[in-house]
């Protein structure tokens, strides 16, 4: 099984316990890596997922600097290979706010909206949040995808 998660920034819910559990269960765990403008233009995505072996997260520059864009030459692709979107079985998604309809407000870059649209239909998509992030209504545009699953506490 291959799962994608993220390294929490600021006050985001921290999925590191989930990541550790997935690794112990033998799952391949991947993290988002922002792409340079040149590579984003070439593949139509601003973000990819890269596999990170258990215990190797501290060496992954895209985990230490999640908002920085990296060129392919900046990353050791044999150590941190790109995981094709269609290979993901599950993805854990951060969010700023959400509503009862599953609408998600992110940080405004549209990276996850674009990425979620290319996942396999069988991929489980799970947003995680604090209860305080629930709002009555999240304004959406045509490209915004609702999350089928949101877990909050």
Enumerate the predicted regions with their spans:
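Short glycine-rich anion-binding loops that position phosphate/pyrophosphate groups of nucleotides
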Residues: 9-11, 96-100
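N-terminal active-site beta-alpha-beta segment that forms phosphate/nucleotide-binding
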Residues: 1-87
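Conserved residues at the C-terminal ends of beta-strands
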Residues: 6, 94, 153
């Amino acid at each position: 099984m291959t799962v994608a998660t993220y390294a929490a920034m600021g006050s985001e819910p921290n999925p590191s316990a989930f990541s550790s559990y997935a690794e112990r269960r033998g799952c391949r765990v991947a993290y988002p890596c922002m792409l340079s403008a040149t590579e984003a233009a070439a593949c139509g995505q601003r973000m990819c997922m890269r596999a990170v072996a258990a215990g190797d997260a501290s060496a992954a520059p895209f985990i230490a600097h999640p908002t920085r864009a990296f060129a392919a030459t900046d990353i050791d692709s044999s150590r941190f290979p790109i995981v094709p979107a269609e290979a993901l079985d599950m993805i854990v998604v951060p969010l700023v706010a959400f509503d009862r309809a599953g609408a998600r407000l992110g940080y405004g870059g549209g990276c996850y909206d674009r990425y979620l649209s290319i996942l396999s239909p069988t991929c489980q998509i799970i947003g995680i949040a604090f209860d305080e992030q629930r709002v009555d209504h999240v304004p959406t545009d045509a490209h915004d995808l609702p999350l089928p699953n949101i877990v909050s506490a």
